[in-house]
Amino acid sequence: MTLQEQIMKALHVQPVIDPKAEIRKRVDFLKDYVKKTGAKGFVLGISGGQDSTLAGRLAQLAVEEIRNEGGNATFIAVRLPYKVQKDEDDAQLALQFIQADQSVAFDIASTVDAFSNQYENLLDESLTDFNKGNVKARIRMVTQYAIGGQKGLLVIGTDHAAEAVTGFFTKFGDGGADLLPLTGLTKRQGRALLQELGADERLYLKMPTADLLDEKPGQADETELGITYDQLDDYLEGKTVPADVAEKIEKRYTVSEHKRQVPASMFDDWWK
């Protein structure tokens, strides 16, 4: 088995999917998991990007089906901007599409800036822009878990195969969640699910960005990665990609393995 095939298997990627069937499987997963845990529903941060839009709509469909079947579950969508978000219109469009039971908004700027200032005062150095970006992601995680803990809700994560293979998420930030309904999907497969669900194409054709950097607001994921999502998707779907692209992907996969594992102990061997 080639490394490419090993990665596809590890990340549960199917080269070809049926979007309607995938929606059904993922909604059922959300329903089954919330029932098994005894939780009261879900909470998820909504950015206006493809991934949170898809996960949010799946979550809302799941809680509606639970209620229609005589159960009780709710979904809270959370806006978590840092000051004024450049693509706020997209976030509002996503909320209109998702139709969450409840939507709330937290501006994380005061918390992030207060921490950054205290860090600088105590350690006599400023956080790097990259590190501050990770603080933003982790404050967003803290906010979602505060809501979830208060109301008995599970935190949904938006990680999918194209992010997982590169480790393109913040450890214990957007990587911190209770369940991951998008696991195994490539970026283009996620788009196909949103198309099937009837989303406005603006929500899945827009340029993907983590938008965590003050110095490079709205920087494209592909710029930061040095790899396009089409290349990532082709690789993950078992297609042939240029040798240098495959090498980049496989290197990122190897060095980011710790992000896909629970914290290491001396009894684990995955890191050796």
Swiss-Prot record:
Question: What HAMAP family does UniProt report for this protein, alphabetically?
Answer: NadE_ammonia_dep (MF_00193)
Gene (UniProt): nadE
**Which pathway features in its UniProt record?**
Cofactor biosynthesis; NAD(+) biosynthesis; NAD(+) from deamido-NAD(+) (ammonia route): step 1/1
Q: Where does deamido-NAD(+) bind?
A: 138, 171, 178, 258-259
What EC number(s) does the entry state? 6.3.1.5
**Gene source species:** Bacillus anthracis
- According to its UniProt record, which protein family does this protein belong to? Belongs to the NAD synthetase family.
- Give the reaction(s) catalysed: deamido-NAD(+) + NH4(+) + ATP = AMP + diphosphate + NAD(+) + H(+)
Instruction: Supply the name of the protein.
Output: NH(3)-dependent NAD(+) synthetase
